[in-house]
């Protein structure tokens, strides 16, 4: 075999020339202790707050506590596989999530991984989950309605696109039912091609039973509403860090629509459980406890999340993100720590009561305690015209009803007021999964406030409403179309409506 020295030296020179000095550097630390979903890690000197780190078995975590001698990491997953002495690697990335229209119709976990068995997610890009809310200049005041399809809410406690409206009440009072009806009510809007009209829905379930979430998804699927919705689920069996991060992940997904000139609504169900998960994490990280053992920054936890809901100005695309946070109270106590915090952050609240629920008033909205601080400027002219009257009459009715319990001899005007009030209360009841369009609500409330329900027995109000609506949808559809297109109840349309209602009232009696 002939070995040529020149060839060998050429190969060696070539190898030396291409020899790189770069070494693969990855910063690693070591697990000091682990338990209850928290790991103490030594090393990782340059880790950032909120950075994603990776354990030996592939489980991920987030660096939350940066102390002098160790880093407190919350673990996004089971901590059973993680042992003392194992290595932890920096990823050099702050926690992010996939965003885009590819997520519509999907169910994902708190980090944006699919959990519905429909294959990988086609995301447009990834965005950080905890970002700064829009400043003052990009914002615009709320001006467009966000219809829920529920008469009691759209007429009396209107919500606008870009608003934050709290839904608060005890357990089993129908809080999630209101959220579900709101999602279902967006179906006709999402069937239209115009992106300005569409309203995408993001629902985040925190600390709920898996069966409840599965049932929710099933209803959306059956009603054809899943195709414009994203479900983010961090159920009761998920670790506290997952329940803490889920609302932020979902908010980022909603922000994609807001920042691209589209509209979205996000429902946090519910933030009480997120606060409990955050309290658990904070106590395990040895942060000092405050009132009700919550950490001192639990207000900031919710304020920085809810401030991300906004209506953007024309220069920034005119998009919006509406937030409907849900809070569960204990025995109607709205003066507890978390409820008062969230009430002060939001632009109004829908207050649900157990007593009303059991009286059969569903949705069980307490109209006296519920307010919408900015929604009235977003209400359509037609709704404003008929709703102003019903508000005053119901307020008088509640006042009189309290006194009427004590005295039996009531004068005629008081009796008339009580009759009208009980029929209007009956009119505001609505079965689940039957949202009404704005123009239909205007017509039935107009009939109620103009005295057409007064001669009827209370138990006939529902039948009257159903009959009137089917008559309007059938032969008199031009009245509904006129209200829908003009968003106003003109004198001409009101006269037509009057003749239809009068004719129907005579035949109904």
Swiss-Prot record:
Write out the entry's keywords from A to Z. Answer: ATP synthesis, ATP-binding, Cell inner membrane, Cell membrane, CF(1), Hydrogen ion transport, Ion transport, Membrane, Nucleotide-binding, Translocase, Transport
Under which main EC class is this enzyme filed?
A: translocase
Q: Which GO terms describe its molecular function?
A: ADP binding; ATP binding; proton-transporting ATP synthase activity, rotational mechanism
GO biological process, alphabetically ordered: proton motive force-driven ATP synthesis
The record's EC number reads 7.1.2.2
Record family assignment: Belongs to the ATPase alpha/beta chains family.
Protein name, entry field: ATP synthase subunit alpha
Q: What organism does the record attribute this protein to?
A: Bradyrhizobium diazoefficiens (strain JCM 10833 / BCRC 13528 / IAM 13628 / NBRC 14792 / USDA 110)
Q: What is the lineage of its organism?
A: Bacteria, Pseudomonadati, Pseudomonadota, Alphaproteobacteria, Hyphomicrobiales
């Amino acid at each position: 075999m002939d070995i040529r020295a020149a060839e060998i030296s050429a190969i060696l020179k070539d190898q030396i020339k291409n020899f790189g000095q770069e070494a693969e550097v990855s910063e690693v630390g070591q697990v000091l202790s682990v338990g209850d979903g928290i790991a103490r890690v030594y090393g990782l000197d340059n880790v950032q707050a909120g950075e994603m780190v990776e354990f030996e078995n592939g489980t991920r975590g987030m660096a939350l506590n940066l102390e002098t001698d160790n880093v407190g990491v919350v673990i996004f997953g089971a901590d059973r596989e993680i042992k003392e002495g194992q290595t932890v690697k920096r990823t050099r990335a702050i926690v992010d999530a996939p965003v885009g229209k590819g997520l519509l119709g999907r169910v994902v976990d708190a980090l944006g991984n699919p959990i519905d068995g429909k294959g990988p997610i086609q995301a447009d890009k990834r965005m950080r989950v905890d970002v700064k809310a829009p400043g003052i200049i990009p914002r615009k005041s709320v001006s467009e309605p966000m219809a829920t399809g529920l008469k009691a809410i759209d007429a009396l406690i209107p919500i606008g696109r870009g608003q934050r409206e709290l839904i608060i009440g005890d357990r089993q009072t129908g809080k999630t039912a209101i959220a579900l009806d709101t999602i279902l009510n967006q179906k006709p809007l999402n069937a239209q091609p115009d992106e300005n009209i569409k309203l995408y829905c993001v629902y985040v379930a925190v600390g709920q039973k898996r069966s409840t979430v599965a049932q929710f998804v099933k209803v959306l699927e059956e009603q054809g509403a899943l195709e414009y919705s994203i479900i983010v689920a961090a159920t009761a069996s998920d670790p506290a860090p997952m329940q803490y991060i889920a609302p932020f992940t979902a908010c980022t997904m909603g922000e994609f629509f807001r920042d691209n000139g589209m509209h979205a609504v996000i429902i946090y169900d519910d933030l009480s459980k997120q606060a409990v998960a955050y309290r658990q994490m904070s106590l395990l990280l040895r942060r000092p406890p405050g009132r009700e053992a919550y950490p001192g920054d639990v207000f900031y936890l919710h304020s920085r999340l809810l401030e991300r809901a906004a209506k953007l100005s024309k220069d920034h695309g005119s998009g919006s993100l509406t937030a409907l946070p849900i809070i569960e109270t204990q025995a109607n106590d709205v003066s507890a720590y978390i409820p008062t915090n969230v009430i002060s952050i939001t632009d109004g609240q829908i207050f649900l009561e157990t007593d009303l629920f059991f009286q059969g008033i569903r949705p069980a909205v307490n109209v006296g305690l519920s307010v919408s601080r900015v929604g009235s400027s977003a209400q359509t002219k037609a709704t404003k015209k008929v709703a102003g009257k019903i508000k005053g009459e119901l307020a008088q009715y509640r006042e009189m009803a309290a006194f009427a319990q004590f005295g039996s001899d009531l004068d005629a005007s008081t009796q008339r007021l009580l009759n009208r009030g009980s029929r209007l209360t009956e009119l505001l009841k609505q079965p689940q999964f039957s949202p009404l369009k704005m123009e239909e609500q205007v017509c039935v409330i107009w009939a109620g406030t103009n005295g057409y329900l007064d001669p009827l027995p209370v138990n006939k109000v529902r039948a009257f409403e159903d009959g009137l609506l089917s008559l309007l949808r059938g032969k008199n559809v031009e009245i509904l179309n006129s209200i829908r297109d003009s968003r106003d109840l003109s004198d001409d349309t009101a006269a037509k409506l009057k003749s239809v209602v009068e004719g129907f009232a005579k035949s109904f009696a």
